[in-house]
């Protein structure tokens, strides 16, 4: 019988085994021990079962914690993520200190999900770059700016050698720089910079609006030649992203932004784990890129959580691996640490670390590219900076975070 396995962290539960049995029955058949034997036989295939209960040390002296895993028969729900989440963590999410930390799906269930359309290799193939972490920059301070300002910002970032440029997640449809115009004009700017430098850059445009409009808007973006889509997935829902990823008329990579996810993941004892929501479920539902706070930036995640997201993005599975994109407060001096912790197959994503460079976006991009090359070539950073003024200026401004 096919099942979905849900793993939870319980906090301050006096009898974990009893609690696990209550959850297994309560979220499937309801009461069990009070049922007559005939009814029990009829409902047995629908009943959840406790797979394991493990006690663990709490985070404080007076706190008790346990990890439980419960198997839910797939016969109880349709093969979609909303049905699963409602079953395993619907009303349960309102019932005390309990956190959903993982979900394991059957191979049959996985076949009903799209996974990333491009994945790491597909994105690298689009760019023709296979040997280093990719570099992404973000539009900053664009609200209230006209199209000319935005085009110049795009141009400067591309001249700096970044591989991807994304809209800010709070850059919505507006009359100064409409969605379709940004795509058309942005493509022309990037065409010109590629002719000038030989370097290809992709632009991810923010897909926004009412949910019912998104599919048609994304299809229109594809018709206009958009490179990729940015989606505030947790404002809309994972199922919305899945629908976009499954649509054959939207042959575009999807970049999943973590906005709003903190409401679900930030508590150590409530909600969902970062790895499950930003890693596994993002990947399964079609994200080619999953953005999340890095462990050492301005909005930092615990390092263990950030690395767990990355692991879920790239571990062997039936789906293409997704690019992990640790973000927030990234500057060139952090690159050795990023590459040590996240390896080659991740994206270095910077906003202020590029735009705040003394020589602007172009200088910021060049500084990042220089230090990436230095790490790959095992060249001392000081030696690289001596031959690259842009890198030296960046290190003078932000310093260097040592990889210890």
Curated annotation (Swiss-Prot):
InterPro entries: Diketo-Methiopentyl-P_enolase, RuBisCO, RuBisCO_lsu_C, RuBisCO_lsu_C_sf, RuBisCO_lsu_fd_N, RuBisCO_lsu_N_sf. Pfam families: RuBisCO_large (PF00016), RuBisCO_large_N (PF02788). Pathway: Amino-acid biosynthesis; L-methionine biosynthesis via salvage pathway; L-methionine from S-methyl-5-thio-alpha-D-ribose 1-phosphate: step 3/6. Keywords: Amino-acid biosynthesis, Isomerase, Magnesium, Metal-binding, Methionine biosynthesis. GO terms for biological process: carbon fixation; L-methionine salvage from methylthioadenosine. Has no RuBP-carboxylation activity. This is 2,3-diketo-5-methylthiopentyl-1-phosphate enolase. Its cofactor is Mg(2+). GO terms for molecular function: 2,3-diketo-5-methylthiopentyl-1-phosphate enolase activity; magnesium ion binding; ribulose-bisphosphate carboxylase activity. Binds 1 Mg(2+) ion per subunit. The modification N6-carboxylysine is found at residue 166. It comes from Bacillus velezensis (strain DSM 23117 / BGSC 10A6 / LMG 26770 / FZB42). PANTHER family: RIBULOSE BISPHOSPHATE CARBOXYLASE, RIBULOSE BISPHOSPHATE CARBOXYLASE LARGE CHAIN. It is an enzyme of class 5 (isomerase). It comes from the Bacteria. Belongs to the RuBisCO large chain family. Type IV subfamily.
